[in-house]
A protein has these predicted regions:
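Exported/periplasmic ABC-transporter solute-binding proteins
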Residues: 1-197
Length: 197
C-alpha cells in the first residue's frame, strides 16, 4: 500500500517516507522548493478587510509566525506585533490540514486582542474558498493554489509551507519514486510494486 500525509505530521506516521525524484522532504527541500510535492498554506479573502481582519492578518504574518513554525515551515520571519485592539468577529473556514495551526493562531491572537472573536471551521480548501467568495466567511484556509477564476476574485497571503510525504510499509525495499511512477500508482497504471521496475 502507498499513502500520503502532510510532512508536518509525518513524525507521527508508522511507515517509510519515500524520496520523490530522488529528493526526501525536509525543511530545507521544502523551503527551497526542490522537493516536488511542496504546497503553500494560504489565507484567502475578499478585497478590503475590516480593521480586526487586517489586525489579525498582520499578526499572522509577524508574531504569529512563531505559532506557524510549530506546525510547518514559516512563510515569513517572526517580527514584533502590537494589536490595535480592533473589535469584531472573524469567521475562517477551509482546509483540515491548516485547521489546528489556524486555531492556535486564533487563540494566541485573541490573547493579544481580547476584543476579537474568531471562529475556525474545518471543511476543505474548496469549500472554504467558495464560502469566502459568497461572503459566508471572512478568510478561507487553503492548502492548494487557487484556480485562475478564484485568484481573480480573491486576495491571498501565504502563511506557511508544507509538503505531501509519500509513505509505504517499512518492510518495502523501495526508496524512491518518480512523479510519473507515483501518478501511475494512483491512476491504476501500476497494479503492484513489480510493475515499477
Amino acid at each position: 500500500a502507498v499513502g500520503y500525509v502532510a510532512y508536518s505530521s509525518a513524525t507521527d506516521t508508522n511507515g517509510k517516507i519515500l524520496q520523490i525524484n530522488g529528493v526526501l522532504p525536509s525543511e530545507k527541500t521544502i523551503d527551497n522548493n526542490s522537493y516536488p510535492l511542496c504546497r503553500d498554506y494560504y489565507l484567502a479573502y475578499n478585497g478590503e478587510l475590516t480593521d480586526v481582519e487586517q489586525d489579525f492578518l498582520t499578526y499572522v504574518k509577524s508574531k504569529g509566525q512563531d505559532i506557524v513554525k510549530q506546525y510547518c515551515i514559516q512563510a515569513d520571519s517572526t517580527t514584533t506585533f502590537l494589536s490595535d485592539k480592533s473589535e469584531g468577529k472573524i469567521l475562517i473556514e477551509g482546509s483540515t490540514s491548516m485547521e489546528p495551526m489556524v486555531k492556535a493562531l486564533a487563540d494566541d491572537y485573541q490573547k493579544q486582542n481580547p476584543n476579537a472573536e474568531i471562529e475556525v471551521k474545518a471543511t476543505d480548501s474548496s469549500r472554504g474558498i467558495t464560502a469566502v467568495i459568497s461572503g459566508e466567511c471572512d478568510f478561507a484556509m487553503s492548502s492548494r493554489e487557487l484556480k485562475d477564476y478564484e485568484a481573480e476574485l480573491l486576495e491571498t497571503k501565504v502563511i506557511g509551507k508544507d509538503a505531501i510525504a509519500i509513505v509505504i510499509n517499512e518492510e518495502n525495499p523501495l526508496e524512491n519514486l518518480t512523479i510519473k511512477q507515483l501518478t501511475g500508482l494512483y491512476n491504476g497504471t501500476y497494479k503492484n510494486w513489480d510493475d515499477l521496475s
